[in-house]
Structure formats: C-alpha cells, structure tokens
Design a protein with these regions (language model features):
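Glycine-rich hexapeptide-repeat left-handed beta-helix
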Residues: 6, 11-16, 20-92
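Short proline/glycine- and basic residue-enriched helix-capping loop/turn segments at helix->loop/beta transitions
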Residues: 3
Length: 92
C-alpha cells in the first residue's frame, strides 16, 4: 500500500510499497519512488529521478532531505491509511 495526498499528479512513475506522496505533489515520467520514501507536500519530482528507499525528498525541484527509519515510514503510512478508512465511515 501507498499513501497519496490530495491533488497529487503521478505521471508515468513507479511508486513502491509504503511510500507517502504529500498533498499537491507532482511526480513526472519515469521517476521511481522507493519503498518507504516520503515526498514532501507541494514537491516536484522531475523525470527520471530515483528516490532511494527510506528517504525524504522535498522542494521544487525535489531534492534529498534526509534518511528515515524504514519502520517509521511504514508505520506512518499505515496510520494514514487507517485514518482515511475511519474518515470514510463518517460519510456513509
């Protein structure tokens, strides 16, 4: 599973498990978002960019910020997914 924020555009890119794509981000052709990686909100990931697993990238264009513990990234992704399931129940 992955988490994709509101108003995100992913165009011809590969997004691996437990990645988190922040709201309003754009991921361009042939980019690869590694497992457990985080793309900060509002970021622009350029074509052919490879984001290593367990790293945080952000900005326009997106650049490496720091490494993150893969287990923390996985837990964050699962928490977000759980919250969205909870929110969906509010509108039944």
């Amino acid at each position: 599973p992955i988490s994709v924020g509101h108003n995100v555009t992913i165009h011809g890119a590969t997004v691996k498990d437990y990645a988190l794509i922040g709201m309003g981000s754009t991921i361009l052709d042939h980019a690869v978002i590694g497992e457990g990686a985080i793309v900060a909100a509002g970021s622009l990931v350029l074509s052919n960019t490879v984001i290593e697993p367990g790293s945080i990238w952000g900005g326009v264009p997106a650049k490496f910020i720091k490494k993150v513990d893969p287990e923390q990234a996985k837990e964050l992704n699962q928490k977000i997914a759980h919250n969205y399931l909870m929110y969906s129940q509010w509108y039944k």
